[in-house]
Curated annotation (Swiss-Prot):
Gene designation: ispF
Pfam families, sorted: YgbB
PROSITE patterns (alphabetical): ISPF
Listed pathway(s): Isoprenoid biosynthesis; isopentenyl diphosphate biosynthesis via DXP pathway; isopentenyl diphosphate from 1-deoxy-D-xylulose 5-phosphate: step 4/6
Record-linked CDD domains: MECDP_synthase (cd00554)
Cofactor: a divalent metal cation
EC class of the enzyme, as a word: lyase
Catalyzed chemical reaction(s): 4-CDP-2-C-methyl-D-erythritol 2-phosphate = 2-C-methyl-D-erythritol 2,4-cyclic diphosphate + CMP
GO molecular function: 2-C-methyl-D-erythritol 2,4-cyclodiphosphate synthase activity; metal ion binding
Protein name in the entry: 2-C-methyl-D-erythritol 2,4-cyclodiphosphate synthase
Organismal lineage: Bacteria, Pseudomonadati, Pseudomonadota, Gammaproteobacteria, Vibrionales
Biological process per Gene Ontology, one example term: isopentenyl diphosphate biosynthetic process, methylerythritol 4-phosphate pathway
Cofactor note: Binds 1 divalent metal cation per subunit.
Keywords of the record: Isoprene biosynthesis, Lyase, Metal-binding
Organism: Aliivibrio fischeri (strain ATCC 700601 / ES114)
Amino acid sequence: MRIGHGFDVHKFGGEGPVIIGGVSVPYEQGLIAHSDGDVALHALCDALLGAIAEGDIGRHFPDTDDKWKGADSRALLRDVYRRVKEKGFALGNADVTIIAQAPKMAPYIQAMCNAIAEDLETELDNVNVKATTSERLGFTGRKEGIACEAVVLLVKAS
């Protein structure tokens, strides 16, 4: 059994929508990033990579490489999960916490869970996504960006 933790943050800027959890969420601004800026999937990638002792997303998909410019984070997540399977592990469960004052995530949570479960080749009840605010405190509370944390449990593949 292995546990991994991931964290990511991106600042708002430019045109919307926000891509998060593999889902397009309408908002007047997008997130500034080298890829599509999906903080949820980036945190999840880091959690998975941490659990298999393979560093972080920046090591595998560096923002200094134009190959990853505008990259679809779902493709990155699938690539990371391929590495997890190559190491002999499978997902036990994943828990993702989005920290954002805006946009409201509730209408999109189920679609996020569906996308993540599909990309991680697992049952829907092995994936949880939730959103919270920081009670108007800090950069997320001032609507300057979005943060996300993810925790995964990996089990030996059968």
